[in-house]
């Protein structure tokens, strides 16, 4: 009997005793779980999950600091992607605490701290740096086997974060920075860097579209991004030039445009960003955009249809941002251990919880069964 | 609901403790502002005024003597600036004032290029909105240093160069006076953006930001002022050292390091007093580390940045100071963390 891919996947996960989120999410989670890496002190690093009341429901220690979790769309699997230069993604069943699998990068490659599952959960997609050459890669592995199925050029250098536009197209933030794990914070190509956003076919690795900042803004490293259901991609920059330079820090782009549509904001707000955007996130409707800046200590919001600036939530050391299933609502996490819930259009923000002695790391993810 | 006597007593003690703790930072912060920030800005503003007067006198009667007077006024103004340079907080953060004070390092010679353009027609600087849109490269001390010391300019022989110098010096004095006035007329807590629902007092949040600024400035001194120009880890770029042309690089470092000690001890209770009460070992360790910084800087010869030393010689001489500043930064970070301040997690080390 021939086994379909879907059936095979289901059987593989079943063989590994991995339940679906729907069948196994505890009642306490109320249909949603939030995931983030966190640290305690300088040397103790974890990935953990909390529910809508902010209580930590699960955590597992990690060998090094992780950057962003990657959450399986259907089964109770969450991966902690090691921070650049990352050499592991550790996968767990957060409902049992069981360690499922470790995936390592290709030889002479490292991860960038982000990964994404395909919509059907059958493939794991990672961004990797072939550090001898600096070539950016998109690597597609079967899940849960981890077998490399395809290896594509990312269309640039330094592919940091990617998001799925649909089941066949991935959008990649090629940050433009060439680095080497021997000295991973040294930028080897500062004067020649050319960041871009690339729309890539997952079927054959073909570049469908690319957009990049104009030459004068070539140090505008594109690091984080999100896509809404209307197909609008939001980009958050980390400018590698001087702190005093007046440069745009947020842009929108679409698959059929090769220009970046920079979003305005008041200059006193732009200056407070300190040239650094952290997380980029649309709300459930795709009409509100949130961009965090831990260096500035706030999250800024825009109305996407009119491209107008809405305001900020001040929050020290904030970086993690994720949409809830309610329109115009976000959950935020900070390095001070806080979890907050914000409705920027009604200017309401409240603290859900604060976990003392714990630093939430850069990015927050969520699984939702209530949608 | 029943509350035991012990629980009530414990609650009262806890409230009293937290209140005393808040008052402690109230006093310390008030005195950091009144006994450190304001007086240092008074000095900085006064020497900026003197510099403006000296450049006016120079342009009125150009000579080697008036030039020398202007250079001395400039040196004093730089030293006064170094006392407050660690503090990128409050009034100085508006209108890009902090970055306009020093356009450094100017890797592409933007300052000289823009000054040459201004010197070609200094009358443009008299237009009403010139300074509101002027490049930060020509608004502060980096530009003044270029005009006084760079071979592209001759403020004694060329009227237009001196006109530019006079205008920038006047603008610099006005800006500094404005920053001073704002510090005198406000409280430090007016300059923060508090979080909604935070339980920390505004005073705690300000002191936390000051501590973050202090820690970050130690990196500036070690990395940008010392390691980078001498080529500690890479190629040397001596001409990009801070105030290299006026030979103020090493004096500036020394002033910064002395300012740290001053900051640590200002007021009653000072940061040091509070630290001694709560974390005596760490407090004393920081005290020793800050003293060691000054001692190590004083070991460097006066011509350290200007004489014909080899890269290897400079590195060897710098090692004790580099290690000392690193050590003091670690000690300061450990101490402020133990005192209950957040020094930043995502904000200090993102990707």
Each model region followed by its residue ranges:
Chain A
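N-terminal export signals
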Residues: 1-26
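A short beta-strand motif characteristic of beta-propeller blades
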Residues: 55-60, 100-105, 147-152, 208-214, ...
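Blade-loop segments of beta-propeller domains
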Residues: 62-91, 97-117
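Repeated scaffold domains used in trafficking and secretory/extracellular systems
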Residues: 65-71, 110-116, 157-163, 219-224, ...
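Asp-box/WD-like beta-propeller blade repeats and closely related beta-sheet repeat scaffolds
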Residues: 108-113, 127-165
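Short, conserved, GDST-rich strand-edge loop motifs in beta-rich repeat architectures
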Residues: 127-130, 173-193, 236-247
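Beta-propeller blade signature
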Residues: 138-142, 190-202, 248-255
